Amino acid sequence: MSKLAELQAETREIIEDLLNDGSEPNALYIIEHHIAHHDFDLLEKIAVDAFKAGYEVSEAEEFKDDDGKPIFCFDIISEVELKAEIIDAQQKEILPLLEKHNGIYDGWGTYFEDPNADDDEYGDDGEFLDDEDEYGDDGEFFDDEDEEEPRVH
């Protein structure tokens, strides 16, 4: 089975699990494609390419891999319907960016959308993502002062 076929099968399983758990089928979902690289400069090139392709990008975070070596990570983010074909198309667009710079694709994730939720996390404009620049206040992609807990996915 090819890498893309494996990713497509995983996408369908994730979507099926979310919907079987009761997540809202008609909601817009924040899709976060998890990207990593041991070389920060190459990771930044992937982020720039993704941004130029129309995606939002999160700030980079630094972690230690299983061998204790630094690894840098960020997310390529979009807000779309929870449809396998859309995520497949995103992966087909994102994977060549990673291959170009020898990046690591660590899958994608999203959040459960409760159909019975009263509160609106999307704010007054109805959009979760805003049009503000995702880079830090100083224009840097990586902020040395941010120390965040590792994400669990």
Swiss-Prot record:
Keywords: Cytoplasm. It comes from the Bacteria. InterPro entries: RraB (IPR016716), RraB-like_sf (IPR036701), RraB_dom (IPR009671). Residues 114-153 are annotated as: Disordered. GO terms for molecular function: endoribonuclease inhibitor activity; enzyme binding. It is found in: Cytoplasm. The keyword Cytoplasm applies. One of its GO terms (cellular component) is cytoplasm. Its main location: cytoplasm. Disulfide bonds: none annotated. Residues 115-153 have a biased composition (Acidic residues). Belongs to the RraB family. Globally modulates RNA abundance by binding to RNase E (Rne) and regulating its endonucleolytic activity. Can modulate Rne action in a substrate-dependent manner by altering the composition of the degradosome. Interacts with the C-terminal region of Rne. This is Regulator of ribonuclease activity B. It comes from Haemophilus influenzae (strain ATCC 51907 / DSM 11121 / KW20 / Rd). The gene is rraB.
